[in-house]
Amino acid sequence: MQWEVVIGLETHAQLQTQSKIFSGASTRFGAEPNTQACAVDLALPGVLPVLNREAVEHAIRFGLAVNAKISPASIFARKNYFYPDLPKGYQISQMEIPVVVGGHVEILVGDEVKVVELTRAHMEEDAGKSVHEEDFTGPYGEPSSGIDLNRAGTPLLEIVTEPVMRSAAEAVAYAKALHGLVVWLGVCDGNMQEGSFRCDANVSVRPKGQVEFGTRCEIKNLNSFRFLEEAIQYEVRRQIELIEDGGTVVQETRLYDPDRGETRSMRSKEDANDYRYFPDPDLLPVVIDDAWIEDVRSKMPALPAQLREQWQSEFGLSAYDAQLLTQDRDTAKVFEELLAIVGKPLAKAAANLITGEFASSLNRAGIAAANAPLKAEHLASLLTRVADGTISHKIAKDIFAILWEEAIAGKAISTVDQVIEAKGLKQISDSGAIEAIIDQVLAVNQKSVEEFRSGKEKAFNALVGQIMKASQGKANPGQVNELLRKKLG
């Protein structure tokens, strides 16, 4: 039997605010346990929540970015459940009327652009954190646990998709696109190690062609793209094997164990009725008028999708390159700065340089584009010298590596022209000089000449390689190809 996978994601993005969603306590990560929890966070008697305006504006900004409807009046509700790190005994969330309704996120899967529809995005407060450490002991030295309430009350935007993804690859592509978008907007810092961006995956399987959904399981708190992919792949295999062996999938919440590469049962999955949602009597509806929405819109940066569309249509960039260039605002900024110097004719070359050598060097060094030691003017000089024929693409890569090493070492960065002069890297474009090198190579490679003349095109490429080697990579590749073909008849 053929099976179809059905996936929906719920993503919790911590909103980038200085204070919590309903109190003035700090949201700074890494403070000593329980030093950033005030009376409101601790649910002490006599205190009332006050909504953080900046958190609402972040939610509006996200809604606009995904072409969603912004609710003119959204309501906060109490989600009732007991857990040690939830001081109030309920979580303030949104149920019936969330702040953001609908919307979509574009993703690139292979060469195909797909659209992931969103159900909603709602504001809520984060819970505290249970701490289970080996060296954390009770008064008699027994193994114990602790509660850190610093995170309690941190503003969250929970972003829920429709169950429209059909593979782990699609889910990861969506998660990466969403992560890039919220960081781009300044809505969330995107730090997955610190829990600022984490996903819950709802996974089910059904026979190919069946309309009804299968029983879903929710995998909680996946805080890396790799874990998300591995957890979904395992869960799909588990459910299919279970059904094919005559078993039944139980609706439940599961955790992913990365050490063992498997999901395991955590608890039975609750429905909305189990949480007994009701409107929070301490909070008024959030009224968002058109003037507020337009004020937020006026302060938004150009969106990744807008830039991708512009660059593809105006400069002829591929969807893949446009996607890479808009992974984060800093990379896009470098491209725009480079483009402002070299102009439209070198747009594709600029994109290739940034997505190639520049991006690879950043990744190897673990450096963000914002902190790149080489700036747009260095890259522009390199592109200009390739364009005017002074150096070849291969030599340009060598010069880039030299400049990068100087910058990383904290040395004064040479100009491109200085490196060309000092190392004698100027491209040979004189046809007479190139012909002399070709003649030398042909004289000692008669076998390749005969193979080419007998119809083997690979032999031609081998000869080009020998000529470039003999010229130490300096011969103009275009002229080499042209002159060699003439000589070979």
From Swiss-Prot:
Pfam families: GatB_N, GatB_Yqey. PANTHER family: GLUTAMYL-TRNA GLN AMIDOTRANSFERASE SUBUNIT B MITOCHONDRIAL AND PROKARYOTIC PET112-RELATED, GLUTAMYL-TRNA(GLN) AMIDOTRANSFERASE SUBUNIT B, MITOCHONDRIAL. Belongs to the GatB/GatE family. GatB subfamily. It comes from Polynucleobacter asymbioticus (strain DSM 18221 / CIP 109841 / QLW-P1DMWA-1) (Polynucleobacter necessarius subsp. asymbioticus). Keywords: ATP-binding, Ligase, Nucleotide-binding, Protein biosynthesis. It comes from the Bacteria. This is Aspartyl/glutamyl-tRNA(Asn/Gln) amidotransferase subunit B. Transmembrane segments: none annotated. One of its GO terms (molecular function) is glutaminyl-tRNA synthase (glutamine-hydrolyzing) activity.
